[in-house]
Each structure stands twice: as C-alpha cells, then as structure tokens.
C-alpha cells in the first residue's frame, strides 16, 4: 500500500482514537468542579479516574484476543459505540457512584480502542514502516490530550454549558469516526475457531480489582497493616495465582504464558508498568494541583499543562520518523526513560509557589520521555512475534501499561490524600484551628476560604503534589533498567515473519506465514 492509501485506511481509526483521548482528557480539568458539585471527596476523585483505567486494563486483553478471531473493523466500531454510550450515561450521572459506574462503561470501550489501534496498524504496516505511523498515532493522542483539557476548561467556565457537556462533546466526533471507518478501513477477515478464555479474563479482572480496592482504601478506611489489608492482599494473590494456573492450561489463553519466554516482551511489560504508574498516576493530579494549589481556572489549568503535551507531540512524531529511517529503536527508549525519570524527580521539588517556568521545563521533560517510550515499547514487541499473535502481544503491553496506570492512580491518590491531611493538620494547628474543621472529606473550593486557611490549603496540596511525583521517580528508573536490558533487533520490513533471533521470538515461525 502507498503512503496515501495507508493514511486513508487509518483516518477513521485515528479519529476514533482522538475521540477516546478527547473524551478522557476533557474531564481532567473539570474533575475538581465535578467532584465538588456531586459532593465527593479525594477517594471519589481517585476512583473516577481509576474505574476507567481498571475497565480498560481488564478488557484490553479480551479485545486483543477477539481481534485474532473476528473482524477487527467490526470490533473497533463496537468499542467506539460502547465508549460513546458510557460518555452519554456519564453526562447524566447524579452521584459520584453513578459517575464511577458510567466511567467503567467508558473504560470498556477505551480498552477496545487502545488494543485495536495497535493491532490494526500492525496488520497493515510492516514493523520498519510502523514507527512513522506510530508517530502519527502519538500525534493524534497529543492533540486529543492538548484539546481535551482546554475544551473541558472552557465548557466548565461557560455557565450555559456546565461540566456535563464534557461527556457529550465527543459524540459528534464519534459518529463521524464510525462513518469514516465504514468507508475507508478495508481489512481481510480471517476465520478462526472461536475460543475465548472467559475464566482467565474473570480471574484476572477480579485479582486486579481487589488489589486496587485495597490500595485505594488502605490508609483511609483502615491501616496499611491490618487484618483488612491482609485479607485483601491474600485474596488478590490467590486470584492471581488461579488466573496464572488457568492461563497455563487454557487451550487459547487470554494472556498466552509462552509470550513471557520472549525476553523483549517480558522487559517491555516491566517498562510499560513503570511508565503507566508514572504517566497516569502522577500526571492525572496535575489539574487538581493547578486549580487548588495555584487557584487557576479549569481553562487556565489546561493551558498550563501544554509544555508536557508539546513534548509528547514533538518526540512521538520526530522519533517515529527517525526509527522508520534507521530501523533502530532501543536508544530512544533509553533516552525517553532517562528524561521521564528526570522529569518526575524535578517535579518532586514543586510547591504552591514554584515559578511556573520551572514547572514548564519539568513537564516538557516528562512529555518528551513518554513520547519516546510509550508507542515504541509496543513496536519493539510487535517486531518479535508471529502475525497471528499480534493482537495478544500488543494487548499484553497495553494491559500492563493500563494496570500500572490504575495502580499508580490508586496508590498515588492515597498518598496525596494522606499527605494533604497531614500538611493541613500542621498548617491549621499553627493557626490554632482544629484539623477536623476545614480539612473535611470534600475537595475544598479555595476561592470561598478565608485568606489564612486558603494559604494553608494551597500549601498542603502543592507540597503533596510534589510528593507524589517524587514517589513516581523510582518507577521511571525501573523503566530505564528494563529497556537497557532489552536486546535490540532491527525492525523487519515485512509482516510475513518475525526476525529470527533464537530465543528472542516467542516461537519459531515458518517463512511465509500469513495472517
């Protein structure tokens, strides 16, 4: 296929990804207002984000496996419909519980879009050329991430719209994406025997859910070291062990265990978990920091994150083209991990009064690091598996990245809540005010607080936000160690077979194998 033909075929897919990213990020700057209006607290704030990531995590391998069995075009259209349905329902939510449930529906659709975008690109484009188009995908993600917070801020700040329109704004784009997908995406349908590992999917979902519930509630509803923690951790471990046993024995497992005999996949998974923890877990609270600690409006909060998104846009597009030209990718993963770690560590120094230009530089480093790492980890994995396992292998990386993100949001959200409580107690005690007063369970509206108390609240959230970025820095370092240990295999120019590299491939594939 020519470059133009590929772009035409990918246009609807890229538009669908844009809808998913836009509909997710448009909420980020509106969340403080949404949670305040729905009378929620820090735990609800965390779960509105975590619920979507959890559903995305749990369903990504299912969508990936289905793509190896059914029409990829039909599946991506179905995932888009599910995502839009969740968005419309979320716009009708009257309580934080209803909103969280609707966000789960959104996450199911997002899991399909996340997994299928990578799988469809891998089906159409040889690995050597894929870096170029992965850059386009990264650019679309960057534009959606840039536009989302800005649009969300404008919607929230416009009195005759209100935050509910944050969930409706993506619907017209979704309808257009469905039409374009129907007209432009042409993929061969490969008929295979249908074997879905529902037991494995159920056990994996249950294990991850229990783990996230424990992380979210520990330190708030009960102590980290308590009988409740022991029961939940033991339960998650037991469910995880059962899932591993089921996957090992399943005829067609959801996450094929033999993939992890591939060194590249194993190390890419470790790096993806680390990137997910840092990227989702730390950056999701930026809007809260800018609005509560610095008193910014939702619109201004979106504008203030532009350096991070700009770094992501530049690195994903430029590096993708360079990788296509050279066929070499490892050095960019290493550089990206270094920048990511440095960005997190530097953001750990931020406080309520940190000069903005310092934060802009630090956020740009994080954006550059994510842009160099996220898509190229998937690319490295796809280069080492046979064509009929592209869906499973791609979804494995996306699964663990989303898992890392969900764990990161839950864990770092718990850290944020704990640190805010401690810092506010210290600050209020210096004013002679009991900490149980203004430090209640809801998110504060700093504009309604008396001057001295507002200063305490702003300082508490600023210091706590710095703490969670500092806590994310070791995960960037873990990603660096993992990518350094990956053995680079030059990108092949054909989808016919993986590069023969001994044990580097999951299984030997005869030449000429076709999807």
List PLM regions with ranges:
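Transmembrane core module of solute transporters
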Residues: 5-60, 199, 213, 224-232, ...
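C-terminal module of multi-pass small-molecule transporters
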Residues: 11, 59-64, 68-81, 89, ...
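Interfacial helix-cap and linker-helix signal at transmembrane-aqueous boundaries
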Residues: 34-36, 66-67, 151-160, 215, ...
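Hydrophobic transmembrane-helix bundles of small-molecule transporters
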Residues: 157-271, 278, 296, 457-463
